[in-house]
A protein has these predicted regions:
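Short glycine-enriched nucleophile-adjacent loop
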Residues: 78-91, 99
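Conserved alpha/beta-hydrolase
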Residues: 15, 19-35
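Alpha/beta-hydrolase fold nucleophile elbow
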Residues: 63-75
Length: 564
């Protein structure tokens, strides 16, 4: 199981490598996540959001050793482990023998179970935290337990200095009391307790069985632990040691990087296919009128104030986009779960671009009325005007292109098990129940991406931002992705320098990571829009195609509804 913004396939690096070493690997989407059903509020946490159901199912299979079952989860997937261990501890026969957390704290103190222990129909918060005194304890008994932690994890492995009240640096996690208690099976650390050592196995006999604890402190951040070869090697080493598996494969013997290269080529190829498919169809009689021939890059005329207006507008737009984006964060749009909008991250990604694009349109109109028009710019010469019938045919063409692209991708996935993904981003088949949620945010994505395409192509296909076509579009693509890149970069810079992720406030540690998630799509979509515009002089076609593809990619990778 994984965190709230991912499908199970993002963790396939671990899955593939474990399977190569002889493990039977079960991967699933948590309830309300990925392709799993949305449950009602009384069923959310039943059986660890699906993890304990999976464990019990695995124990019924003849090819699974019932005495060698382990669970592993990344980020919020670790929460499911917390809940599942709570249930397994209460079971007549415990099924789980080993636990590996990735980018998630273990349970250190007995009162921490209150935050996740409410399982409707099974336990109450009071029962879950019956030892509600905040003392360190051994939650895992004689199971083998490990943690893969990133030195710069944005969310986990945080501890407050009891003397100063300040956050302790994340890279010093092995010096924290939480880590020292965990490695020593729940003791209450004091000044004599040695700091932890990364990769060292701490052993102890518990209830007559020798168990171990281990923490792998890796370079990297919260989600990078899913892609780093060193973290994968640690995960292999843990499971092999936990169950004394005889394998000739070393922990560093991995093949996933080749799969990642192939899936990245496929993901980029999907956008390329959409561009060339659109260009080909635009020449067909059915869609005649959606293309007006090749666009010619205009030479920006030099008038007094030209550069000042151009760069001034750019700076104003960037500043507004930065402020409006942070405003959305501080008002919890990215975590919003309501009765109408049920995907906060999708709502945020669409709103962020739509709001800044509308503001850009207003600034551009002011620029046109106050400067460009007075200096001879003719609105009829920049491909902005169109007809209702042309818009209709453009919409039909965009739907045909995106529909064909998705069918091609899904067909390749179904017949050849091809993966179209790149790190965080990917596209895969989805359940029909997601279509309604997609349609809710589609208008927001359309506003953002269509206006962005108009700005990039109609207004700026000239030498103002670069003397040739390649430089021009690269500059504009970088500008489009600049706000999330700068905000994320500022947060990361503070984090890397101090070890504390608090630039935007202790309650908003997610900002550097979440902002980074939007950079790739905001950079690549101007390239696809320009590729289509340069051969059709139709700014709306690329904008609509980008909006639909970006919306699908965002929605299929986000939770629908999920508890805390």
């Amino acid at each position: 199981p994984l965190r709230r913004q991912r499908q199970m396939c993002i963790r396939d690096r671990y899955q593939i490598e474990w399977a190569r070493r002889g493990f039977v690997v079960f991967s699933f989407d948590l309830y309300g996540h990925g392709d799993s059903e949305i449950l009602n509020n009384t069923e959310w946490l039943v059986n660890g959001r699906g993890l304990y159901d999976t464990v019990k199912y695995a124990a019924t299979l003849p090819f699974v050793d019932k005495d060698q079952i382990a669970v592993s989860g990344q980020s919020r997937g670790g929460n499911t482990i917390h809940e599942t261990i709570l249930l397994d501890n209460k079971a007549k026969k415990q099924l789980i023998k080993a636990v590996l957390y990735v980018s998630r704290d273990a349970v250190y103190k007995d009162n921490e179970t209150q935050s996740f222990g409410y399982v409707p129909g099974k336990t109450t918060s009071a029962q879950a935290a019956s030892k509600n005194n905040g003392e360190y304890f051994n939650y895992y008994g004689n199971r083998n337990v490990g943690i893969i932690a990133g030195k710069f994890d944005q969310y986990s492995f945080k501890e407050t200095d009891k003397t100063t009240g300040k956050m302790l640096p994340n890279p010093d996690y092995l010096k924290h009391n939480n880590a020292k208690s965990f490695l020593n099976f729940g003791i209450t650390p004091d000044s004599s307790t040695a700091d932890g050592v990364s990769g060292k196995y701490y052993t102890k006999k518990v209830d007559g069985k020798e168990a171990f604890r281990v923490i792998y402190l890796e370079n990297g951040f919260h989600t990078s632990q899913l892609f780093q070869s060193s973290s994968t090697a640690a995960a292999m080493e843990f499971m092999v040691k936990a169950f004394n598996v005889n394998t000739s494969l070393q922990s560093g013997d991995q093949i996933y990087q080749w799969r990642m290269i192939g899936s990245t080529i496929g993901f980029i190829g999907m956008f390329m296919f959409a561009v060339f498919f659109a260009l080909w169809l635009s020449q067909m009689p059915l869609f005649r009128g959606t293309s007006r021939g090749n666009a010619i890059m205009r030479v920006a005329e030099s008038h007094p104030g030209t550069k000042a207006w151009a760069w001034g507008c750019l700076i104003v737009n960037t500043l507004f986009a930065t402020v409006s984006t942070l405003f959305l964060y501080y008002n919890g749009v990215d975590t919003h779960i309501g009765t109408f909008f049920r995907q906060g991250q999708a709502l945020f990604a669409g709103s962020m671009l739509a709001i800044s694009s509308v503001f850009t349109a207003i600034v551009t109109y002011i620029w046109y009325r106050c400067f460009a028009k007075k200096n001879g710019m003719n609105i009829d010469e920049i491909d902005l005007k169109t007809s209702a019938f042309s818009v209709f045919k453009t919409i039909m063409l965009a739907l045909t292109v995106t529909g064909g692209t998705l069918l091609l991708v899904w067909g390749a996935q179904y017949f050849f098990k091809t993966n179209f993904s790149f790190l965080y981003w990917g596209i895969m088949p989805f359940g029909s129940f997601k279509i309604v949620d997609m349609l809710k945010v589609l208008p927001i994505f359309l506003i953002g991406y269509v206006i962005s395409s108009i700005f990039i192509n109609c207004m700026n296909y000239n030498t103002s931002y670069g003397k040739n076509k390649i430089v021009n579009i690269l500059v504009l693509a970088l500008v489009t992705a600049a706000v999330p890149a700068l905000v994320s970069g500022a947060g990361w810079a503070k984090f890397m320098l101090t070890g504390v992720n608090d630039l935007f406030g202790a309650a908003y540690t997610r900002i550097p990571d979440s902002m980074f998630l939007t950079v790739f799509l905001l950079f690549i979509t101007p390239l696809t829009a320009r590729g289509i515009y340069s051969k059709t002089r139709n700014p709306y076609l690329g904008g609509i195609i980008n909006a639909i593809l970006a919306m699908v990619i965002t929605c299929v990778n986000c939770q629908v509804v999920f508890p805390a």
